[in-house]
Amino acid sequence: MAAISRAIKQELLEDLKPEMYLPPKSTRRRAKVKTEEKVDVKTLVKSKSKKRRAAKNELEENVEFVRRFAPRRPYQWRGRQVRALPRPGIPVVFTPGQRSGVASKRSYDEVYADEDVLDQSGNMINEFAYGKRVKMLTHKNPTPSQVPITPQEPIARPGEAGLLPTVQVLAPRDSKHETMLPVTKSEGGDVKVENKGFEQITPQLGVQTVDIKVPVKRKSEVEDEILKRAKMEPFETTVKMEYSEQPQVEVFDTGVEPSSFFEVRSQARPIAVARKRRVPTVEVMEVQQSDHTAPTASAAPVANVIVGPHLSRRPSRWGPANAIYPDYVYHPSISAKKTMGPRPTGRVSRWGPANSIFPEVRLHPSMVSAVTRAAPRKSTKSRRRRRVRTRRAFVLPAGTKTGVMLPQNIRYHPSILFRRA
């Protein structure tokens, strides 16, 4: 009875108020636009534009979703180190919403490689020649308690691209570095050599271990005898440093290199000598002179020239650095004598001893008259100067093309000269 009454009520309800899902009609009335004549102001909204807007809104409301978008997951880029390391043959693609695995297998369509890529990897060529980890065949260590005592370095085979096999000596880790005494075969006994065999580490590397046992323990009596013999032997030096006679000290001027004993040079090249405080002593300097001839065994003995006693040169205030003069080579046109500047007296320089080192200069003849000459230095050492007289070259008398003779001490352009051969 209840079901019949429910059906009657539903039928009556559908007739009275049908179940239609339509947008409700707007109860708002349109605003009437009141137009006034003779008004310059435009209306705010035109009727045509209102119709167009209404049609546009209807299209936007009835939007049909053709496909379903994949859900985007947020990615935390902050603090991440992005390293793009694509191997050859991997297409760089982005699939939204799909997480890439750590070592995901590639489908065959994504692989672009040679047909013999497996053979290349086995032979370690082309792509697999450099920068690839080789396959370790074993991790066995036959000598776990040994430490290397010699370096193992690659040795190139001359003339070939291969390498020679290397040897590395290992020793027990607990062995102490004892004093090495002379060991013979009779004292040491028999040496045991044991070959551990050949072990293949990688396809191109093998290790062969050879165990060598050398017994070095001896009887205490023999060891004591060797130590006693070593202690009783007198200590002898290999090189004997003896003087046939007492060494003779030769003292020269500070900062000047001693010249040769067989030829007295006119100018000795100065060198820098470390400053030492010397005690005034009587010095003897032997000088041998020869007229540019090599000394022979049958030559007559040269008498020694003994210099009288004199006090050694008092070290200057600034040390031997003031004796260093540069070794100059001048132009042949500079033939004037050396012009000596005034020596500094008292306080040498405001800026230190470096400014007091002045070289002895030679000026051009045209500049000699303009420079006042100072008094020459008082030197106790006599200087020998070798004057080289050069013969002036013969110059033909020069004249112009018209026949006028020109003075010889004036240089003219070659285009105006006329010389007779």
Curated annotation (Swiss-Prot):
GO biological process: viral release from host cell
Gene Ontology, cellular component aspect: host cell nucleolus; virion component
Keyword DNA-binding: yes
UniProt keyword terms in alphabetical order: DNA-binding, Host nucleus, Late protein, Viral capsid assembly, Viral release from host cell, Virion
Localization annotation: Virion; Host nucleus, Host nucleolus
Induction behaviour: Expressed in the late phase of the viral replicative cycle.
Main location: virion
GO molecular function: DNA binding
Domain of life: Viruses
Subunit structure: Monomer. Homodimer. Exists in equilibrium between monomers and dimers in solution. Interacts with the histone-like nucleoprotein; this interactions bridge the virus core to the capsid. Interacts with core protein X; this interactions bridge the virus core to the capsid. Interacts with the endosome lysis protein VI; this interactions bridge the virus core to the capsid. Interacts with the peripentonal hexons. Interacts with host NPM1; this interaction might play a role in virus assembly.
Task of the protein: Associates loosely with the viral DNA to form an outer shell around the nucleoprotein-DNA complex and links it with the capsid by binding the endosome lysis protein. Dissociates from the viral genome during entry. Might be involved in nuclear capsid assembly of the viral particles through its association with NPM1/nucleophosmin.
HAMAP family linked to this entry: ADV_CORE5
Note: All late proteins expressed from the major late promoter are produced by alternative splicing and alternative polyadenylation of the same gene giving rise to non-overlapping ORFs. A leader sequence is present in the N-terminus of all these mRNAs and is recognized by the viral shutoff protein to provide expression although conventional translation via ribosome scanning from the cap has been shut off in the host cell.
Family: Belongs to the adenoviridae core-capsid bridging protein family.
Name of this chain's protein: Core-capsid bridging protein
Organism classification: Viruses, Varidnaviria, Bamfordvirae, Preplasmiviricota, Tectiliviricetes
